[in-house]
Amino acid sequence: MTTSSTPASAWTGRHDGDGPEHARWHQAVQVVRRREADGDGPSGEVAEAGAAVPDPAADHVALLGFRSDEGVRRNRGRVGAADGPAALRRALAPLALHGPLAHGEVQLHDLGDAETVGEDLEAGQAAAAALTAHGLDRAGARLTVVLGGGHETAWSSYLGLMGSGFGPRAGQRWGVLNLDAHFDLRSEPRPTSGTPFAQMAAAEHAAGRELRYAVLGIAEPSNTGALFEKARGLGVTWWTDEQCLAAGAEGITRFVEQFAAELDVLYLTIDLDVLPAAVAPGVSAPAAHGVPLPLTAAAVRTAAGSGKLALLDVVELNPSLDIDSRTARAAARLIDDAVRTVTGAGA
């Protein structure tokens, strides 16, 4: 089975009361129960069932997970990111909610997980793409958030976006902003966690389009000259981790605003190895330099506040390497920042 509903036990935490003034994520999330579909590919229908099914037409944020680290294994990384979705839910669960999220005016719907079984990454990505497209196409969805998983998640996010009513199907200009220490533009015989944006570029070229791709946080020592040359050839816009630090929050805000200004739809992907190792030790490749959390958060809030953010994924959390759940907590804060900004749910 490559898709499954989230168990209710995934959303538990401190309970201070039942009113909106006490609201936390675990009290607000509504778990979508689904019948198993015959097909798990992009065309397989994701069926919702049960007496208390969350209304897909209600104003909401859709959440889903992709339990996969086969792409990391193929990329010779340290596996464990398949456990990322569960750890991210645990980190999100106790966070306080405010405004329309606390009052239930904007809901949180958990659509469940897709999974890579064994070494069949491609089937897992197809299942995740179908679930992602379903999240995007739910009538009331303001934002779809994918909890990874290795950065192979980005390819399934792309397929989901292309299979949804957003982007090219709607005649919309779309682009992807990657917060990452790496370009992930590798050319490999098989897809890995290091190839998703090369795959996107090839797919866009085949469709007669150019990939609009920007990256914040590139670590020069972690990307070869060949990767920089490939990025230049594809017209990628990027800042290194050192440039991000020098530019500060204002500069990063301008970078994101300028990128989003040319788009109708924005897809944001956060590889947690963009953060310094002290903040995010729980990743396959911890960053010696990294982009400080406040600057990364500025990029996230600017993207979320653009009015164009439709899809967010957060990837590369490896709980087995995480110290004191630092990485999971930082990731949860960034997800919460994005959701609060999109929904206008400040305190």
What are these regions (language model features)?
Residues 2-65, 70-347:
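Conserved alpha-helical scaffold segments that buttress catalytic/binding sites
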